[in-house]
Amino acid sequence: MSEQKTIPTAPAPQVHGLRPVETAARLTGWALLLAGLGHVLRAVWEIRLWTAGEPASGPPDQGEGVHRPLNSLENSYHLVTFLVGVTMVICAVFFISWMWRVRDNSVALSRERPKYAGFWVYLGWVLPVANLWIPRGVIADAYRKSVPGRKLPAVVTAWWALWVFGMACGTGLIYRDSADKLIERAYTGVWPLLFSEAAMVAAAVTGFLMVRAVTAAQTERVASLTAQPRAEG
């Protein structure tokens, strides 16, 4: 009777410089959804301001440094706006951390220099004009280097288009309004604000899907490179 022996196999190739990305992706996804929820909440308050109508005393910011006392609804809008800002900061911290990991992993997988230097992971969000394309470019470059030959998911472009639209028509790239100015805009013309909030919510949801798609593609590539086939005979 012959004995069955295990034939030793060569160890799987090791990819050096990889960073764990699954936990960062999960936290980033939840942070994006939390930020989207914040924009939903602020949209509700903007509708409440619009339906209530501007008080007879006029807008909160009456010009020349004069501000009238806020009513209870306006005070609560300030609080909601503050909470939205907090969720955006949390989202930014997790998102940038995820971007760093995905970018570093793409370099380890491809052994090629990234298209954008590391400082663009931060500055790409805040420099005028550059912030219209560089953050998306960093992610797209990391995806293409991680899975060469695979088409960039459409959700990457959809997420970025919604983000830029939401920032442009609301409070960001064009408007730098205080909460009091936003209250005034809600009283007199709420629709641009609501379009902005809707776009930001959609950007949060598509961003969640984008993070999952990019992370899944990268982890799949890593798994294919590090798998150890077993042969028995």
Describe the predicted segments one by one:
Residues 84-91, 196, 200:
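Alpha-helical transmembrane segments of integral membrane proteins
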Residues 188-198:
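Membrane-interface transmembrane-helix boundary segments in multi-pass integral membrane proteins
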Residues 67-88:
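Interfacial helix-start motif at the membrane-water boundary
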Residues 81, 85, 105-106, 190:
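Generic signal for short, ordered secondary-structure residues
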Residues 2-73, 94-123, 130-164, 169, ...:
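Membrane-interface extramembranous regions at the lipid-water interface
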